[in-house]
Structures are given as structure tokens and as C-alpha cells.
Amino acid sequence: DRLLTHANSVLGLVESGVGVVPGGGGVKTTYQRWFEATGDADTAAWETWMQIGYGKTGESPEQATKLRYFRPGHDETVMNRDKLITRASAMIRNMAPGYTPPEPPKMTLPGQAIFAKMDAFMADGLAKGWFKPHNKTTAMEIATIVVNTSSDAPLEVTEQDMFDRERAAFLRLAKTPETKGWINAMLSGAAIE
């Protein structure tokens, strides 16, 4: 429920660089934080999609604040890396008495109009040579997580719905030959083609 980082920590979700989406709730949490910050489903979907699609990182907790990965006043930073375990243990001890997990969030995903905007952005970037075809495939899978792709109407979702959407997108991408090739290239130190 709280994050403790070293002052030089780099925070971000970079999985799209090898053709998959973040697993384990990364897309859900990013969307949730953008939605809470803006109160607007379209903005939250667009910011989450751009951030995860480009694999944006904050080179420090301060920079990660702009990406909603670090929450000042809630999360903490230590200057000395050697103090991480000691401070984390103290945080846990302080949180433990009377601890209850947060209520599972409910979120609203925007309708498919924003999906069309995302698709047009990727098509334009592909035509200009900014992206490879599989970048578009990966980006549009991220979009399926944060947009109601079946209707123009907003869609209320639970945390579990978001986990299910993430898992489905991850598995679809993991089965593609392009993602397999990108992962193999990364593991062997070769350039991603």
C-alpha cells in the first residue's frame, strides 16, 4: 500500500519494448491513478496508453511523480541505499496495527471513440516510420485494457476485470512470433528488429 524507494530509483513499466504488456496489475494501477488524478476516463486512458506504450520511466521518484508511479506524501524515499531494509521494516511495523487492505477500486473505462484516436495515432506513426508494425499491435493491446472496445458507452470495471484484461492482452501478445523474436533478441543482446 506504500512504496519505499531509493532516491536514485528508476520507476516505470517498460514491457512494451519487448512486445508484451505489464502483468501483475501495472496497467490497472497506472490507469487507476490517472483516473483518480484527472477524474476523466478519456484522459486517464490516453495518458496510461501513451506512458506504457512508450515505456516511459521516471529517472527518480520526483520524476516518477509526474507519471503517477510515486505518490508524495504517501510513498517515501531514502537517500542512502543501505537504509532501505531498515526503513521498510519500520514502515511495516507502523502500518501493521489495525491494518486493513484498501477497498478494491472501481473504475470507469471510456467508450471506443478514444480507441479510434489511438488507432489513428499508431497508423500515422507507422506511416511516418516512427513505429514497427508490432509496436502498433502491442499498443492496441494496451488500448484493449483501458478502453471499452465494444461500445461507445463508458464501462464500469472492477480491479479483477482489469487484471483479466491485462492477462488476456499479455497472453495474446506472448503467442505472437514478433514478441517471441523481440524477447529472444533482448535476451541475447541483439538489436530488436
Regions found by a protein language model. Give the residues of each.
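Hydrophobic transmembrane alpha-helices
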Residues: 20, 71-74
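CoA-thioester-processing core
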Residues: 1, 5-40
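Intrinsically disordered, low-complexity segments enriched in small/flexible residues
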Residues: 32-56, 60, 66, 72, ...
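Residue-level detector of family-conserved "landmark" positions at structurally sensitive sites
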Residues: 7, 74-75
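Active-site-proximal glycine-rich helix-loop-beta segment
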Residues: 1-3, 7, 60-69
